[in-house]
Regions:
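Charged catalytic and DNA/RNA-contacting regions of genome-maintenance
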Residues: 54, 89-96, 100-131
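Electropositive, glycine- and tryptophan-enriched low-complexity nucleic-acid-binding patches
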Residues: 56-59
Length: 131
């Protein structure tokens, strides 16, 4: 409906990243999506990460973009962000879903993250419903 509250956030500080992590830890299902520089997961660099835990609520963590002049999180944004999110992404008790999540898993593996707890892939579901 028109009056439905929408909570969309851009994570630009370590405090905001820590708030996101608290929200992710308390959820039943985490939707994950990466924005990258390539469709080839072997060479893709992470441009940003998106997370959602409920309808009309999401977070985006920008890593690389044209207007970027300084690091947001420190010397190496991606390393700081990945190090903070790694425990959640590797926690098999936290269910995760995504669109073509296999791609995201391959990219994150190159960054040292072995994502666990995959529960659903919307791309596979779409293919099964409409082969």
């Amino acid at each position: 409906t028109k009056d439905q509250k929408k909570d969309y956030y851009t994570v630009l500080t370590l405090d905001q990243l820590d708030d996101l992590i608290i929200n992710l830890k308390s959820s039943n299902l985490i939707s994950l999506d990466l924005e990258t520089t390539s469709t080839n997961p072997s060479i893709a660099e992470i441009v940003g990460l998106s997370f959602s835990i409920s309808k009309n609520s999401a977070w985006y963590i920008p890593i690389m973009y044209p207007e970027k002049k300084d690091d947001i999180f420190g010397k190496k944004d991606i390393e700081v962000v990945i190090n903070r999110l790694k425990n959640i992404l590797e926690d098999s008790s936290l269910a995760k879903t995504g669109q073509n999540i296999k791609y995201d898993l391959h990219v994150l593996k190159r960054y040292g993250v072995n994502v666990q707890g995959i529960a659903f892939d919307t791309m596979i579901a779409a293919h099964l419903l409409n082969p």
